[in-house]
């Protein structure tokens, strides 16, 4: 099956607090989209590049200040945008991101930095065609972290995640769609796929009827 080209590509960002189910949804969406012939790339932030790796190390050691984390995050994101996001959407692919700039706004905002300034610092980052916000209460997110065998890091507390959740929900981004992620993975996937299909229906037009029919099947 030849890949179906999407005019101007498509950028899907999946957001939410830790334990919301972002990685699971990203993988499920990619599998579905690839199955109907859409070239699909899954990436994440922080990336596996040098800046992203440095940041993940700091999440364990806690040695970076919020301001230092912002600097590293922005360096990582600029490289991500230039090396992967822009080239892939430019060739008509679907790019699915497991976290993007709203995570920086929420997490660094929860650490006390001004949300408006954080949004302005990310003005260079392409805006998602659809931003899927998986919403769960912090107590559920933390429970899921423990259930998958992980240990919450120094920031993953009920209080901090509550502040992050509030910022996520308050962000005024035109493509943001909130999904109740307390539901099971199948229900969340179905809701997310429907929202992605809404954008594809506009992008692909009549030529995409077959693709949309397969996605709905």
Swiss-Prot record:
CDD domains: TMPK. Its EC number is 2.7.4.9. ATP binds at residues 16-23. Keywords: ATP-binding, Kinase, Nucleotide biosynthesis, Nucleotide-binding, Transferase. GO terms for molecular function: ATP binding; dTMP kinase activity. InterPro entries: P-loop_NTPase, Thymidylate_kin-like_dom, Thymidylate_kinase. GO terms for biological process: dTDP biosynthetic process; dTTP biosynthetic process; dUDP biosynthetic process. It catalyses: dTMP + ATP = dTDP + ADP. The keyword Lyase does not apply. It is an enzyme of class 2 (transferase). It holds the Pfam family Thymidylate_kin. The keyword DNA-binding does not apply. Gene3D superfamilies: P-loop containing nucleotide triphosphate hydrolases. GO terms for cellular component: cytosol. Belongs to the thymidylate kinase family. HAMAP family: Thymidylate_kinase (MF_00165). Phosphorylation of dTMP to form dTDP in both de novo and salvage pathways of dTTP synthesis. This is Thymidylate kinase. It comes from Xylella fastidiosa (strain M23).
């Amino acid at each position: 099956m030849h890949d179906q080209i999407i005019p101007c590509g498509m950028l899907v960002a999946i957001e939410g607090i830790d334990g919301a189910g972002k990685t699971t949804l990203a993988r499920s969406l990619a599998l579905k989209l690839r199955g109907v012939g859409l070239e699909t790339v899954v990436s994440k932030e922080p990336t596996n590049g040098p800046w992203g790796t440095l940041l993940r190390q700091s999440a364990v050691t806690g040695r970076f200040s919020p301001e230092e984390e912002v600097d590293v995050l922005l360096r990582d994101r600029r490289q991500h945008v230039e090396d992967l996001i822009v080239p892939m959407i430019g060739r008509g692919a679907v790019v699915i991101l497991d976290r993007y700039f709203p995570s920086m706004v929420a997490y660094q905002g929860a650490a006390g930095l001004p949300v408006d300034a954080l949004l302005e610092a990310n003005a260079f980052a392409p805006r998602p065609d659809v931003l899927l916000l998986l919403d769960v209460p912090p107590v559920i997110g933390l429970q899921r972290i423990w259930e998958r065998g992980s240990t919450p890091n120094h920031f993953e507390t009920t209080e901090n995640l509550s502040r992050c959740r509030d910022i996520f929900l308050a962000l005024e981004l035109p493509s943001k769609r909130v999904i109740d992620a307390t539901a099971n993975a199948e229900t969340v996937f179905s809701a997310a796929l429907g929202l992605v299909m809404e954008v594809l229906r506009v992008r692909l037009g009549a030529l995409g009827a077959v693709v949309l029919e397969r996605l709905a099947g």
